[in-house]
Swiss-Prot record:
Reaction(s) catalysed (UniProt annotation): (E)-4-coumaroyl-CoA + 3 malonyl-CoA + 3 H(+) = 2',4,4',6'-tetrahydroxychalcone + 3 CO2 + 4 CoA
Entry's EC annotation: 2.3.1.74
Function, in words: The primary product of this enzyme is 4,2',4',6'-tetrahydroxychalcone (also termed naringenin-chalcone or chalcone) which can under specific conditions spontaneously isomerize into naringenin.
Listed name of the protein: Chalcone synthase 9
Protein's organism: Daucus carota (Wild carrot)
GO biological process, one term: flavonoid biosynthetic process
Amino acid sequence: MVTVNEFRKAQRAEGPATVLAIGTATPPNCVDQSAYADYYFRITNSEDKPELKEKFRRMCEKSMINTRYMHLTEDLLKQNPSFCEYMASSLDARQDIVVNEVPKLGKEAALRAIKEWGRPKSKITHLIFCTTSGVDMPGADFRLTKLLGLRPSVKRFMMYQQGCFAGGTVLRLAKDLAENNKNARVLVVCSEITVITFRGPNDTHLDSLVGQALFGDGAGAVIVGSDPVIGIEKPLFEIVSAAQTILPDSDGAIDGHLREVGLTFHLLKDVPGLISKNIRKSLVEAFKPLGISDWNSIFWIAHPGGPAILDQVETELSLKPDKLKSTRQVLRDYGNMSSACVLFILDEMRNASAKDGHRTTGEGLDWGVLFGFGPGLTVETVVLHSVPT
């Protein structure tokens, strides 16, 4: 008869959790940021607010975003005029859309990850689904299981209303699942659409306008597992460690509240300062055990909450301009897609590394960091190790 310790040892994987495939998806509707102020004020019937429109135009210009993708088309907004008001009761109509569309967009990203992975869907043992766009029972994880045709016994985890830091959270959870369950293959999906947050402008709530200028729709998916099957599975990044912390003196810096009017966001101007002031401590705690203290010697995947956050992090840590290249590229092409962003940046980095002839998936470097920032202020710090391209 085996002992408990022997049984537990046999249950666990030998190697570190590894990202084995990545997939991304967006709605087909692409929005030109340079024309968005005119469109937004027209579709929300707010042309009588020229000064506010000019403020919003400047926000869009400073966002460093070129394009975003949105499920909400002009036709859909005309069918739901309450979405275009500032604070109209509209949650039912918003929910009717997101409970269907969030899993569907997640499915598109998941299928691309599964195709790259190259193994049967029946080998997926766990599913982690994350969204800040609506809530439902059974959840989006259940709907995605049905849409993909996963085994009914797949072990599901549903994360609602976590916000922008959760792209790090899902990797932290996937790491623990993969390393503590031998042969586990974890499908991770983050799917976000702005149907739940879109609303018209108001000059007393400028932080809401900031969100209207930054947020876009997208879904990212990864498959995580330990001990890759040689010749079948292709490792992309190893997940070495993961930590979460609440920043000091940051209560109320980023808040989100689900109300009859949808999901409202409240942001303090000091968010970039709070993050940049505390980021060094998170880096030291994560990399001191590895003997790393040069932040330019690692590759960077940082949630692009907005250009001000990235600029202040660069300044605080004296980062070279190219350190946040992949992060800024995703912000430029897609905007802030909340939890899905860092998965898009992972994809951008491994693709750019191969295209540019780097020796590893991490821009030729061995070690890297993935940061998630969001409500709390909460910070997720994930240490990654790249693999040869």
